[in-house]
Regions:
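Membrane-proximal intracellular helices of multi-pass ion channels
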Residues: 1-248
Length: 248
């Protein structure tokens, strides 16, 4: 009993996440600093900034990715963006699973209520569904963007579609083009696809899962959390649209 309590005190999920993040940043900086990852010499601070930005999906860079990095370097950044996005979506799940072997039924009910999950939800199933959701959405987005980019005659439409799909779904804002997505400002199809991916990533997995459970009659009603997320999303979208249209 004492050993169990001692182990619980020694294992700190938050420290694990922090050191894990730092570890990925160090690996990312090391890889992106390799000569064949750069088109031009890029300083340590610039590489560090870009890697942290990718991991945290903020979308800020110290320069044009197309001018700074080779395809290998861009793949590294894309991997970090995806890792950062999935990490945020599974952060809570990771914290739960870190103690899942010793979690009590009482604690499961508390977590179920806190995160608006069904009382009998399975943690491993929950995480696997997040991954499946990510794969499905990004696959659909990639196919649609690839079709549109091919119509526009862009070079390497598949690679461009993959990168911008992951970036949009992660709400990272990264682009392999020097002018970002400005070249598509008059393309309704591309903008709608990007917007869909951004929304799908921003609302997360719980909302569509909750709606699916309601439509399949596995739950009696949509949870309060989902209602709040959808309400705020709609309100922000409408308000932003009105302000934008009014100022244009």
């Amino acid at each position: 009993m004492k050993r169990t309590k001692l182990k619980d005190k020694e294992v700190n999920p938050f420290k694990t996440i922090l050191f894990g993040f730092l570890g990925y940043v160090i690996i990312g900086v090391a890889l992106i600093s390799l000569p064949f990852a750069q088109k031009i010499p890029v300083g340590f601070v610039d590489n560090l900034f870009n890697v942290v930005s990718a991991m945290s999906t903020t979308g800020l860079t110290t320069g044009s990715l197309s001018d700074m990095y080779t395809p290998f370097g861009k793949i590294i950044l894309l991997g970090l963006i995806q890792l950062g996005a999935i990490g945020y979506m599974t952060l809570t799940s990771f914290l739960i699973l870190s103690t899942s072997k010793k979690i009590s039924t009482h604690r499961v009910k508390i977590l179920s209520a806190e995160f608006s999950m069904p009382e009998n939800f399975d943690l491993k199933h929950f995480i696997s569904n997040i991954i499946i959701y990510t794969i499905i959405v990004e696959f659909i987005g990639t196919v649609l963007l690839c079709i549109e980019f091919s119509k526009l005659g862009l070079q390497k439409p598949l690679w461009s579609a993959i990168f911008h799909c992951v970036s949009a779904f992660s709400t990272a804002g990264f682009s392999i083009y020097a002018d970002g997505l400005c070249r598509f400002q008059n393309d309704v199809s591309v903008n709608l696809i990007i917007a869909f991916l951004c929304y799908a990533g921003a609302i997360g997995f719980i909302v569509p899962m909750d709606i699916y459970r309601r439509l399949t009659h596995k739950s009696k009603e949509i949870t309060f959390t989902t209602k709040i997320i959808l309400f705020i999303t709609v309100m922000i979208t409408l308000t932003g649209s009105v302000i934008y249209i009014g100022s244009s």
